[in-house]
């Protein structure tokens, strides 16, 4: 019998996080900070690949679901799979929003809004670049994410 073992994604302890992350990455993922709009790594980045949690490596978003929303942060129409994210109400700063976090590492990623392209489901996942690591499509196998290669096919399906 061939049982494929589910990959485990874990959060490092605080000391290791501070060693491995930049100050901005730490503040965004661990302290719910927001990076500056338009002055971040992935806002205008459209290479084929996946975006994973900078803390745990959890696969979060596909480049083919990324779009230019004009908001200044990377925007996606949907996550790779809902099993890798969690959403919760966020009433901070006098606003009512839905926060998006990674499921296992509990990293703050950004927020989701219902003003995305209608033809792609109407959602806009507005995500901080500092919470992400990009893995190019041609590096997915090498980095241990080969299971996501079929999602780049024309008739892709959500996991």
Curated annotation (Swiss-Prot):
One GO MF term: peptide-methionine (R)-S-oxide reductase activity
Catalytic reaction list: L-methionyl-[protein] + [thioredoxin]-disulfide + H2O = L-methionyl-(R)-S-oxide-[protein] + [thioredoxin]-dithiol
Enzyme's top EC category: oxidoreductase
One of the protein's GO biological processes: response to oxidative stress
Superkingdom: Bacteria
Database matches in Pfam families: SelR
Keyword terms, alphabetized: Oxidoreductase
Matches recorded under SUPFAM superfamilies: Mss4-like
Active-site residue list: 126 (nucleophile)
Chain ranges of the MsrB domain: 14-137
Enzyme Commission (EC) number: 1.8.4.12
Alphabetized InterPro entries for the sequence: Met_Sox_Rdtase_MsrB, Met_Sox_Rdtase_MsrB_dom, Mss4-like_sf
Keyword Zinc appears in the UniProt entry: no
GO CC annotations, alphabetized: cytoplasm
PANTHER family: METHIONINE SULFOXIDE REDUCTASE, PEPTIDE METHIONINE SULFOXIDE REDUCTASE MSRA_MSRB
Family note: Belongs to the MsrB Met sulfoxide reductase family.
NCBIfam families: peptide-methionine (R)-S-oxide reductase MsrB
Family annotation (HAMAP family): MsrB
UniProt name for this protein: Peptide methionine sulfoxide reductase MsrB
Annotated organism of origin: Hathewaya histolytica (Clostridium histolyticum)
